[in-house]
Amino acid sequence: MANKTEALYNALLPMKIAGFDDIMQAASSVIEGTANRKYIYRKYVKRLIEAHKLLAIRKGLYAILSPLEKAEKYEPDKLLIASKIRKEYYLGFHTALEFYGCAYSAFNEAYVCVNSKDRFDPFRYKRFIFKPVFIKDTTSQIVEKPYGSSLLRVSSKERTFVECIDRVQYAGGWEECVKSLENLRGLDVEKLISPTLHQGKIGLPRRIGFFLDILRKRSPFYEHVTDTMLSKMEIEIKGSPQYLVRGKKSSLNRRWNLYIPDAFEEQLRGI
């Protein structure tokens, strides 16, 4: 293998996962002069793939294998791959819960939150499925977290909480969601209240309040939730009662003006 090809491989190796833009940037410090993408692919990337030092995950996305790794035994890193699909993104919902170490179950899906202009088709790589979730705001309450030699963009704990309650289908359903959230440490409830109220969704404050009320009874990580905090949600409740789960026999929780499925809390306790 040519020396420059080997030098490019060594430059990419710490990344473990690289998009083609990463490869072009690394190549600019290895080769002399400038080169277009087709040339870099044909001259270097293709050779590294043939030498089993790069694995193509999808078009424009590659795994970099260490000298001791075998292609047939390669175990992909779901979070690292998800972080390289788009430049403007964040890992959210159940994927964020997994990052924070509180997810009740490990999912094969990775939820990559992007603006609709950055959409991509869902794809599978080995046992993992990578899915876009379309979000208008991809910058508020997003934090960069070190992950190996990389940085991941992840929704803050507070935004993760709100979004999981708001779109529970991306958090694994109510049982998985609640069991995961009860292990979410270090939640700043005041930071959670503000974005909830500013979203302007009529049903969201009552759902957030209801689940904070449940969680402070279930988890030591929510013992700091006070009635004063909950009252900020309570005074925002407007309009007719809403159903937490449609199509199920439910009873009205008058405090939160929310129809809750019968035996819902008992079922959660039995998880």
Roles of regions detected by a PLM:
Residues 63, 111-113, 131-133, 246, ...:
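Residues in well-ordered beta-strands of folded domains
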Residues 92-145:
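Exposed, interaction-prone assembly regions rather than primary DNA-binding/catalytic cores
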Residues 23, 59-60, 109-111, 174-177:
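Short coil/turn segments at secondary-structure boundaries
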Residues 1-88, 185-201, 212-213:
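Short beta-edge/loop segments at beta->alpha junctions of small alpha/beta modules
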Residues 143-271:
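Hydrophobic alpha-helical interaction segments
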Residues 78-85, 94-97, 155, 233-236:
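Positively charged, aromatic-accented nucleic-acid-binding surfaces
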Residues 46, 54, 101-104, 121-122, ...:
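A general structural signal for short secondary-structure junctions and capping/turn motifs
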